[in-house]
Amino acid sequence: MAIILGADAHGNALKELIKSFLQEESYDIIDVTDINSDFIDNTLAVAKAVNEAEGRLGIMVDAYGAGPFMVATKLKGMVAAEVSDERSAYMTRGHNNARMITIGAEIVGPELAKNIVKGFVTGPYDGGRHQIRVDMLNKMA
């Protein structure tokens, strides 16, 4: 599984910590960060890279997470969630089949960020009754 990472200048330090953590866990990392671009361009780069292949997940980090969430959910086929706790990160994979999360570096500290990322990348999609919701989400954008 490849994990696509992106950040703007406000989220880059936390993104680098997340990157190191994921590399230690032996995940394939594709970092599409352009430190000179704002969160919109970096979020689009992450979301597009995630949508290029099945089995990819994306993580975008900026100051608060809200802006990248809004950008990502504008794209066809992208189910994303703004998260600031481990349980939400895990559950958005299980119930919503989210392929991307956004994190705010001014909200989430280093250890919590690692736990959020772990929950997201290890959380399986439950399917079943949740597939109806996922199909509805995919039709919207």
UniProtKB/Swiss-Prot annotation:
User: Which reaction is recorded as catalysed by this protein?
Assistant: aldehydo-D-galactose 6-phosphate = keto-D-tagatose 6-phosphate
**Keyword field contains S-adenosyl-L-methionine:** no
Keyword tags = Isomerase, Lactose metabolism
Zinc in keyword set: no
Q: Which Pfam families match?
A: LacAB_rpiB (PF02502)
Q: Which Gene3D superfamilies match?
A: Sugar-phosphate isomerase, RpiB/LacA/LacB
Which HAMAP family has this protein been placed in? Answer: LacA
Q: Which family does it belong to?
A: Belongs to the LacAB/RpiB family.
Q: What is the protein name for this chain?
A: Galactose-6-phosphate isomerase subunit LacA 1
Tell me what organism the protein belongs to: Streptococcus pyogenes serotype M3 (strain ATCC BAA-595 / MGAS315)
Q: Which gene encodes it?
A: lacA1
